[in-house]
Each structure stands twice: as structure tokens, then as C-alpha cells.
């Protein structure tokens, strides 16, 4: 069932798991072909978690876009309010026509 390992002579035959574990190479001892790294086949795992700024930058970008849109809407609303105020000041006023046309007709 077990193949004979080079370290089998050091351990008794009653404990085969010892030499099987001892014969397994560690990750740092394995040879990695540089061509494999470029093709993505044998990529070593990272020991620390990776940090990415893509998500926080996207959140900030969206908030900036929303803030710019809100500012433009506020300015447009203010311009419309001024235009409405001017319109309402002139509605129903007869003073504007008083200087240009006579108020009485002489027949």
C-alpha cells in the first residue's frame, strides 16, 4: 500500500505515516516554472488578505456625482423661482399699459 521512501530506513515499518509526512515537500520547496506563472496555472497563494481601493473609490465617485446633480438642481430651482417671481409681479398690473395707450377713448 505504501511506497518505500528515502527516509523509510530511519523510521520503523509500524509508523508509515511518519515517512509519508516527512517526504511531502513544503510550498517553499516546490519548483515553480515562470511560464506557469504567466499563464496563471501555478499562482502562489497570498499569506495576507489583499486590499482593494476600487470599491471605496466607486462609492466616493457615486457620492460626488449625486452631490453635483443636487447642486445643479438647486441652482435650476433658484433660477426658476426668480423667473416665477418676476412673472407674478407683472401679472394683472395695469401700470405697464398706462404709459403706452390712452385710458379713455373720445368718440
Swiss-Prot record:
The keyword Secreted applies. It is found in: Secreted. Keywords: Amidation, Cleavage on pair of basic residues, Hormone, Neuropeptide, Secreted. Expressed in corpora cardiaca (CC), corpora allata (CA), antennal lobe (AL) and gnathal ganglion (GNG) (at protein level). Expression in AL and GNG detected in some animals, in CC and CA in few animals (at protein level). One of its GO terms (biological process) is neuropeptide signaling pathway. It comes from the Eukaryota. Residues 1-44 form a propeptide. SMART domains: CRF. One of its GO terms (molecular function) is hormone activity. GO terms for cellular component: extracellular region. The keyword Secreted applies. The modification Valine amide is found at residue 91. Disulfide bonds: none annotated. This is Diuretic hormone 45. It comes from Agrotis ipsilon. The lineage of its organism: Eukaryota, Metazoa, Ecdysozoa, Arthropoda, Hexapoda.
Amino acid at each position: 500500500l505504501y511506497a518505500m521512501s528515502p527516509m523509510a530506513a530511519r523510521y520503523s515499518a509500524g509508523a508509515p505515516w511518519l515517512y509519508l509526512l516527512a517526504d511531502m515537500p513544503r510550498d517553499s520547496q516546490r519548483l515553480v516554472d515562470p511560464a506557469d506563472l504567466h499563464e496563471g496555472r501555478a499562482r502562489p497563494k497570498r499569506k495576507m488578505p489583499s486590499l482593494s481601493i476600487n470599491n471605496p473609490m466607486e462609492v466616493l465617485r457615486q457620492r460626488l456625482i449625486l452631490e453635483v446633480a443636487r447642486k445643479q438642481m438647486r441652482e435650476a430651482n433658484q433660477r426658476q423661482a426668480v423667473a416665477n417671481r418676476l412673472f407674478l409681479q407683472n401679472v394683472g398690473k395695469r401700470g405697464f399699459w398706462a404709459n403706452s395707450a390712452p385710458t379713455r377713448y373720445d368718440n
